[in-house]
């Protein structure tokens, strides 16, 4: 009996010692100036900015997976488009009088020019290497059929010619010309079908995963930067001095560590909302999220791939979210060309591709449940669209492909599940809650923590989004002569608009094209087109947009 008692006492002491050791390990605080949560393109971009602006600041990046750029930034988990509104028709909505609004298109294009300048600067510094590994010239095209859609594209083309950012765009309604631009799209098509297309040679395909890996690899060369993989944030607590204590679990050995940070950035993609809620800042209460996934059909058949060099976007059908429009794209992934068609919406309660089925439920709180319900009730057409997408059969997806590639063969294509996108739902005083397309930087009043919510245009505008975050959180420093000079070295057009300034637009496009190895020819005169008939549009309930 004494032996048993002694054994139990010994085990209890041992377990207590292990427990105390674990607690001691968790209580050992690592201190850092900046904590970057998430190993994607947003954290990598912000870290790169801060490395130039404040090289002495210490930075720590924590990533839940075993490597960086494995979620939404991964090339296979997104469309890889350098979004600049050259072909995306949802950025040029039609007004009630039939005219075309280009304000959103101009803003998107301006933002992408900042990304191009940021990447070019990093190439010149040796931070990014071999531009062809992450960005390639792929012409951007819009393609439509039917009298009304052709008339819309005419009006869109005419409206965009008023901006210096869209000079060089071509327009045609000629079958032979469009076939020369995009053979796959035209071969086998009814020669009597009314079609129209625009084409811009300076479009790009971008591998955001490769950019992310290279940016982080450069950051790792500095002794005051630390990357911790397989590390999951479990808790965030504000301290009395407005620093943050963040508890991080090592998923490989089960230990925990506390990191004390002066500034925290939550760039965790779909997981950002839950972490923002965990922080307890009042600004988080206005937000909820709704996850939507995307699938693509993929072809690696050389007969298909070598016959198509463009990204071709169509027009969304009536009742579908504008951003959901199908497109057939040349991609450069893992060093080789492939063709993708989609996206097709999917549904999962996960906020990340590698997330938990409990993500949606665990992010629903008493403060955001009502906005979510209002969005569902106000956007029944969107709900119907998502249900119809989830119910698509293999044959349905193939028929959708044949609208863009009439001679497609089933055996050339396979289905790929891309990443998850968490759509922003924000509390609204009038409607209760609204679905917001785009990204949004949410920060506390003290500027000690910030999160990026939303999905589109996302990675292609990482540089301007993080620039916006710097202005919002580090406003005093941004206005200082030192930071101003550095930011203008990184982004030459910082603080001014390119739109309307032909010389400045051409200068920046020429510069970034040369450094990034992209095609650029000075624009010629605009194509002559039939005059669009601006017909008043019937009043229709606006369909909320989502990003896939």
From Swiss-Prot:
Name its co-factor(s).
FAD
Alphabetical UniProt keywords? FAD, Flavoprotein, Oxidoreductase, Tricarboxylic acid cycle
Low complexity composition bias: which ranges?
530-541
| Functional pathway | Carbohydrate metabolism; tricarboxylic acid cycle; oxaloacetate from (S)-malate (quinone route): step 1/1
Q: Its Enzyme Commission number?
A: 1.1.5.4
Instruction: Recall the GO molecular function terms of this protein's record.
Output: 2-hydroxyglutarate dehydrogenase activity; L-malate dehydrogenase (quinone) activity
Q: What is this protein's record name?
A: Probable malate:quinone oxidoreductase
Species of provenance: Escherichia coli O17:K52:H18 (strain UMN026 / ExPEC)
